[in-house]
Amino acid sequence: MRQIIIAAGIAILVSIMLTPVLIRVFSRQGFGQEIRDDGPQHHQKKRGTPSMGGVAILAGMWAGYFGSHLVGIAFGSDGPSASGLLVLALATMLGGVGFIDDFIKIRKARNLGLNKTSKTVGQILSALVFGVLVLQFRNTDGLTPGSPQLSYVREIATVAMPAAIFVLFCVILVMSWSNAVNFTDGLDGLAGGCMAMVTGAYVIVTFWQYRNACSTHPGIACYNVRDPLDLAVIAAATAGACIGFLWWNAAPAKIFMGDTGSLALGGVIAGLSVTTRTELLAVVLGALFVAEIVSVVLQIAAFRTTGRRVFRMAPFHHHFELLGWAETTVIIRFWLLTAIACGLGLALFYGEWLATIGD
């Protein structure tokens, strides 16, 4: 628990202190965000707001993770784990893709950065590296960071995938989650606030898995997760980094996280879902992100097949703005929906444990 608190604390401090530095530097360099002309017109006043704030989020995550381990090692705790490093590496690789995308947008003064093919290739390569490595690094208990079995709140024994299919599954997960968070990042503080709650929920999930790990507490309801405590540290560092960034990103935003932040944070959800054996539970915890990407898919599918749109604009947070909702109203209500989804996800997680104990 000490390491979890330290990770969150360091991440908050680094993120909240580094972000204003980035605001000043990026403002001097003219690294401002371009705004879509077809979006809500009141968004045009945001043109020129510094972007690439995801750099501060990633810095907070790295500092929180390794800072907590430096303290932990001093008290005799284990160092970084394969699971934690893989999730952090996935987030960083995706953040790198996002950084290139953001930089091109800024240099060319347009709302489009990398072309779709280049961006997709970057995401796929990041996912492939993660998918292959997550089945390596077997520990003394025979556990690898990931499992080829599909999982809900623990592995589903009847649904096992060959290694190649599992890697493809990881690609789909990473692509889906990174794009889902990217689509959600369209209003001030929306994605950051939702991510803080989802990763906060993952702190609870992973700490519970640690307290009921099969390696230390064998039983019918124990969890076969390789490094649950270290994954809790990763989740706490991510939540802390998002909270620190949110101080400056809340409406009216002084800086945007950009694709640097949104792709990286989507990678965190994908990575945690695989390494904690909760791929299906993640859909509940991150239901708001799922709804955002589904709204985009529905909009495209409906327009291409019928010539009509389901929403006035997608992602659907803009739909509510065009209906007349104030931006802050949309943000707060979506935060509330995320809090409800996280509460439901945690209830399902704990309920499954109680049901297993009862059996």
UniProtKB/Swiss-Prot annotation:
Function statement: Catalyzes the initial step of the lipid cycle reactions in the biosynthesis of the cell wall peptidoglycan: transfers peptidoglycan precursor phospho-MurNAc-pentapeptide from UDP-MurNAc-pentapeptide onto the lipid carrier undecaprenyl phosphate, yielding undecaprenyl-pyrophosphoryl-MurNAc-pentapeptide, known as lipid I.
InterPro entries tied to this protein: Glycosyl_transferase_4, PNAcMuramoyl-5peptid_Trfase, PNAcMuramoyl-5peptid_Trfase_CS
Top-rank lineage group of the source organism: Bacteria
Protein name: Phospho-N-acetylmuramoyl-pentapeptide-transferase
Main location (coarse class): membrane
Organism expressing this protein natively: Mycobacteroides abscessus (strain ATCC 19977 / DSM 44196 / CCUG 20993 / CIP 104536 / JCM 13569 / NCTC 13031 / TMC 1543 / L948)
Membrane-topology descriptor: Multi-pass membrane protein
Assigned keywords, A-Z: Cell cycle, Cell division, Cell membrane, Cell shape, Cell wall biogenesis/degradation, Magnesium, Membrane, Metal-binding, Peptidoglycan synthesis, Transferase, Transmembrane, Transmembrane helix
An MF annotation (GO) of this entry: phospho-N-acetylmuramoyl-pentapeptide-transferase activity
Localization, UniProt: Cell membrane
Lineage: Bacteria, Bacillati, Actinomycetota, Actinomycetes, Mycobacteriales
